[in-house]
């Protein structure tokens, strides 16, 4: 293969690519490679560019199979018609560790053997795998705690408390609470899974967001009143047209208002404020904003970026005491994302919190 053609093809590729000659020196590198590994890569020994023994061994094997000690055992053979190796490794790139999928392939050249090294960033895959591991671990923990308690109470009921009606009633009440907690968790997990699976499909139903918000406020008014909290809806006396999934948007505002009553009810009032936005830059057009405001104790700023993570809680014990699963705001985030909207969270300790959902404005009436 002609040198000029190789350099031209490598330069056009979007992923980092290096070409190594028979002397194990880099003779071509594209812009993506220099951005990842540093400037002035050409004419350098390959071992000084990518210091990973498995990759270096694969390059040596393809350049000179007869003199190489052995093929790298921890790389998968194949991946190119001319023969090669593939492996997922962690490389050092500009002072940081980067999980990468490396493909090393033979590159026939007019002046002798050469090797092509392709580097694909796999950090996204690694992050997804780790997120899945964390998710499974969190679910296991959340289910194990009430299950362990219930098993303990069952053993007690079969033993010391068998003939104690008062203890039996007390333990059965606790078991009912723990079972309800597990049921809420399972329902939220199913809801989150369903929302995530639908996130790429934008809903097209036309509805009146103002009417929906007022219905949520009415539904939760008795629960709030029992806790000494008043729910008040402000703004937008007329129609508030949006395109959306009525059930999912009801779930969004139900979660937000319920949280405001539970955690911010000390202020005695929760306000739902509906406002029109003439033009939202990120949504590229008119929008509607619904702010759920409480006058409670507020949330420290360091927690705000993580509130929509699965199972993230500001206060684990308090959340569990109030029946929280740690999934409500994650569900809210995904539903709002499906509606091509955004969620804004503002809070100051001692001053309350404001959760604002901003959705693109629809046309016509709901």
Please describe what each predicted stretch is.
Residues 203-206, 225, 230-240, 277:
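Conserved catalytic submotifs in the C-terminal HATPase_c
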Residues 197-202, 241-244:
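Conserved micro-motifs of the catalytic ATP-binding
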Residues 177-182:
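Short alpha-helical segment of the dimerization/phosphotransfer core of two-component systems
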Residues 1-33:
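Sensory modules in modular signal-transduction proteins
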Residues 209, 298-306:
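Short helix N-cap motif at coil->helix boundaries in the Bergerat
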Residues 203-218:
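A conserved beta-strand-to-alpha-helix junction within the catalytic ATP-binding
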């Amino acid at each position: 293969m002609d040198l000029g053609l190789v350099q031209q093809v490598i330069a056009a590729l979007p992923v980092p690519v290096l070409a190594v000659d028979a002397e194990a020196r880099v003779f071509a590198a594209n812009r993506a490679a220099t951005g990842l590994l540093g400037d002035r890569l050409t004419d350098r020994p390959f071992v000084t560019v990518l210091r990973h023994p498995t990759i270096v061994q694969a390059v040596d094997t393809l350049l000179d199979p007869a003199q190489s000690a052995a093929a790298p055992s921890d790389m998968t053979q194949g991946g190119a018609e001319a023969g090669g190796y593939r492996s997922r490794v962690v490389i050092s790139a500009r002072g940081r560790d980067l999980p990468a999928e490396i493909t090393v392939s033979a590159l026939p050249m007019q002046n002798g053997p050469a090797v092509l090294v392709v580097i694909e960033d796999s950090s996204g895959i690694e992050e997804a795998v780790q997120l899945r591991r964390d998710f499974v671990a969190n679910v296991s923990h959340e289910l194990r705690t009430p299950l362990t308690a219930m098993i303990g109470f069952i053993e007690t009921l079969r033993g010391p408390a068998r003939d104690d009606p008062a203890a039996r009633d007390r333990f059965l009440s606790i078991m009912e609470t723990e079972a309800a907690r597990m049921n809420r968790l399972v329902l939220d997990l199913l809801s989150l899974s369903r929302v995530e699976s639908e996130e790429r499909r934008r809903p097209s139903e036309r509805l009146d967001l103002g009417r929906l918000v007022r219905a949520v406020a009415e539904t939760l008014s008795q629960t709030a009143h029992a806790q000494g909290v008043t729910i008040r809806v402000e703004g937008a006396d007329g129609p508030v047209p949006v395109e959306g999934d009525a059930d999912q948007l009801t779930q969004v505002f139900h979660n937000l208002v319920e949280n405001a009553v539970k955690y911010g009810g000390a202020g005695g009032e929760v306000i739902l404020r509906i406002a029109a936005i003439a033009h939202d830059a990120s949504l590229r057009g008119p929008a509607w904003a619904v702010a759920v405001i409480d006058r409670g104790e507020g949330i420290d700023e360091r927690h705000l970026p993580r509130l929509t993570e699965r199972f993230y809680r500001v206060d684990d014990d308090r959340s569990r005491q109030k029946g929280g699963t740690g999934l409500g705001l994650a569900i809210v985030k995904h539903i709002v994302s499906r509606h091509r909207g955004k969620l804004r969270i503002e809070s100051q300790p001692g001053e309350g919190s404001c959760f604002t959902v901003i959705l693109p404005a629809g046309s016509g009436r709901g």
